[in-house]
């Protein structure tokens, strides 16, 4: 478009077309309370991606990926790092615990991860998680337990305190660590002192920490880039497949989740723009990952929870134990109110439905289809936790298929009653299901379209 065309009679109010250019990002997000199997969907898409990004959270996420019979555990590294042909990006919205990053990489190196340093790009605007943030995380949990008789159930990875430092403008970023170290040291000491004033029992070995941080600075220096410019370049350069791997999930989002039992970042689609510094225009497909039943770690309202043999069966058959915490997960029936709510916020292109095979032994399967409050149906998902505790779930009963689906590789292989379950979810949420997972391995994801 010539300059002349842009500025013809500005008073005439001619609407200029927006430049719809550049590569689109494919986004994978959790649609429940986490642990939906996002790592598996990311792994599937990562094989053909050029760039794989993390945009929020820290090493509180837990993704397990199985490749060639080897199991890799990722917490902070994008799980696409196992793709040797792709670049992996840790965006500005991620909080980085440097010892955790290297520990995780070394652990995965033992399983065969190679040359990850050459493929990792770290945004210079990302905030740093210090050891004292992790210590404070633990102390705050103890405090909450003492004051309220309950805690949030954080992973004690320092995520919340780091985002608090960020919001109160006392945090330190990767760019600060790589700039004047004297200035960094002074700000580090001040931050440590602030926390010590709040928590008198907190011990911080300032000099020891700074010495380690100086070493980490040199190790990460080659990986650090201006994240905004890097993403702009990637979007506006030659055609590239860019994938964003969400951590946590919709109901753990700081704004839209079951507050206060949430994480400290936006794990919905808005967090992709703010956590990477990209325009909404460049967001392409947004895939929601949904487990065929519901699980939750820690406390907080859980309307479809089954504190009975159904819950126990799901827990044992599904091996529902947290990757990061090792805690048993609470289990219940699939809740479509949650999925509709997650879709209102994220606008999903399609769902990936995982762990369908866990339901193989059920005679009858229930699905939560709506909530009633004081006898009246409500069209929204309640914000207040006490209100959410009180909702009455209306269920639909579906017959179980009572046969092993773990060997199914295409839609036609699935029992008719399993097909009906899938269609039921699609119709009632209004989002198509693109993949169905029936096992741990890469091959056990049935692609529907």
Swiss-Prot record:
GTP binds at residues 34-40, 62-64, 329, 355-357, 437-440. The keyword Lipid metabolism does not apply. Its EC number is 6.3.4.4. One of its GO terms (cellular component) is cytoplasm. Its cofactor is Mg(2+). It catalyses: IMP + L-aspartate + GTP = N(6)-(1,2-dicarboxyethyl)-AMP + GDP + phosphate + 2 H(+). It is found in: Cytoplasm. GO terms for biological process: 'de novo' AMP biosynthetic process; IMP metabolic process. GO terms for molecular function: adenylosuccinate synthase activity; GTP binding; magnesium ion binding. IMP binds at residues 35-38, 60-63, 155, 169, 248, 263, 327. Binds 1 Mg(2+) ion per subunit. InterPro entries: Adenylosuccin_syn_GTP-bd (IPR018220), Adenylosuccin_syn_Lys_AS (IPR033128), Adenylosuccinate_synth_dom1 (IPR042109), Adenylosuccinate_synth_dom2 (IPR042110), Adenylosuccinate_synth_dom3 (IPR042111), Adenylosuccinate_synthetase (IPR001114), AdSS_1_vert (IPR027509), P-loop_NTPase (IPR027417). Substrate binds at residues 35, 323-329. Pfam families: Adenylsucc_synt. Mg(2+) binds at residues 35, 62. It comes from the Eukaryota. The active site is at residues 35, 63. Transmembrane segments: none annotated. The keyword GTP-binding applies. Keywords: Cytoplasm, GTP-binding, Ligase, Magnesium, Metal-binding, Nucleotide-binding, Purine biosynthesis. Pathway: Purine metabolism; AMP biosynthesis via de novo pathway; AMP from IMP: step 1/2. Homodimer. Belongs to the adenylosuccinate synthetase family. Component of the purine nucleotide cycle (PNC), which interconverts IMP and AMP to regulate the nucleotide levels in various tissues, and which contributes to glycolysis and ammoniagenesis. Catalyzes the first committed step in the biosynthesis of AMP from IMP. This is Adenylosuccinate synthetase isozyme 1 B. It comes from Salmo salar.
């Amino acid at each position: 478009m010539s300059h002349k065309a842009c500025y013809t009679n500005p008073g005439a109010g001619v609407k200029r077309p927006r430049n719809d250019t550049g590569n689109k990002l494919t986004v994978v997000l959790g649609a429940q309370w986490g642990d939906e199997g996002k790592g598996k969907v990311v792994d599937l898409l990562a094989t053909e991606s050029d760039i794989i990004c993390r945009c929020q959270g820290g090493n509180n996420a837990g993704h397990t990926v199985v490749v060639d019979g080897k199991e890799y555990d990722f917490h902070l590294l994008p799980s696409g790092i196992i793709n040797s042909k792709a670049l992996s990006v840790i965006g500005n919205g991620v909080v980085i615990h440097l010892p955790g990053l290297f520990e995780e990489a070394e652990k995965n190196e033992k399983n065969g991860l190679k040359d990850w340093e050459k493929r990792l790009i770290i945004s210079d605007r990302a905030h740093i998680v210090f050891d004292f943030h992790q210590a404070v995380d633990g102390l705050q949990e103890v405090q909450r337990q003492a004051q309220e008789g309950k805690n949030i159930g954080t992973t004690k990875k320092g995520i919340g305190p780091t985002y608090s430092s960020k919001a109160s403008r006392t945090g330190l970023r990767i760019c600060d660590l790589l700039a004047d170290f004297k200035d960094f040291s002074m700000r580090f000491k001040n931050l440590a002192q602030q926390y010590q004033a709040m928590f008198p029992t907190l011990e911080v070995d300032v000099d020891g920490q700074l010495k380690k941080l100086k070493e980490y600075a040199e190790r990460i220096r080659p990986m650090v880039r201006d994240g905004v410019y890097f993403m702009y370049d990637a979007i506006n350069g030659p055609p590239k497949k860019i994938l964003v791997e969400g951590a946590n999930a919709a109901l753990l989002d700081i704004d839209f989740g079951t507050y206060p039992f949430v994480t400290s970042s936006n794990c919905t689609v808005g967090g992709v723009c703010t956590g990477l510094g990209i325009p909404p225009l460049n967001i392409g497909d947004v895939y929601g990952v949904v487990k065929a039943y519901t699980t939750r770690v820690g406390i907080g309202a859980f309307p479809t929870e089954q504190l009975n043999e159904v819950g126990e069966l799901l827990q044992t058959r599904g091996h529902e134990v947290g990757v990061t915490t090792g805690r048993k997960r609470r289990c219940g029936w699939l809740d479509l109110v949650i999925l509709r709510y997650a879709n209102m916020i994220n606008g999903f292109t399609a769902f990936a439905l995982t762990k369908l095979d866990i339901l193989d032994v059920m005679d009858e399967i229930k699905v939560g289809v709506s909530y009633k409050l004081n006898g009246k149906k409500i069209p929204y998902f309640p914000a207040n936790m006490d209100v959410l505790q009180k909702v009455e779930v209306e269920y639909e009963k579906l017959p179980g298929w009572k046969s092993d689906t773990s060997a199914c590789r295409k839609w036609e292989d699935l029992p008719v009653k399993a097909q009906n379950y899938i269609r039921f979810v699609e119709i009632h949420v209004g989002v198509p299901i693109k993949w169905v997972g029936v096992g741990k391995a890469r091959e056990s994801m049935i692609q529907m379209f």
